[in-house]
């Protein structure tokens, strides 16, 4: 079956890379949707896992729950994935409400980043930054484990998250 093949996962990863190239801002850190460990990566890992397991559930949260119940994701992975995805979606929602338009990246202005962290209820940008990086890393590690490692047949080495763009 195509959905169970390594070729399928290579196509998923290639599609994600194409989206990053075409829609990304050029700053992986700021790209909360298309960047490494971003919203789209979380959606792709769940959708690819759904296809492999023949789970046809359109709602991301319900699909993640079903994958957890079927033991595709461990309880810890599923919990962290859902928390991280929820965190990024909250960031997106707050940005969208403030800008009154679709938003796929954090603001590049440090003062606007600080304002975002306050709107999200943080006392400081540093604490928000830590949680943001943790959420992105969590999603990326899970994506690596279920899409990248699987399509190459061996565990892949993780590269450290580049914070120099922050």
Task: Show which residues each predicted segment covers.
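A nucleotide- and high-energy phosphate-metabolite-utilizing enzyme signature
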Residues: 1-166
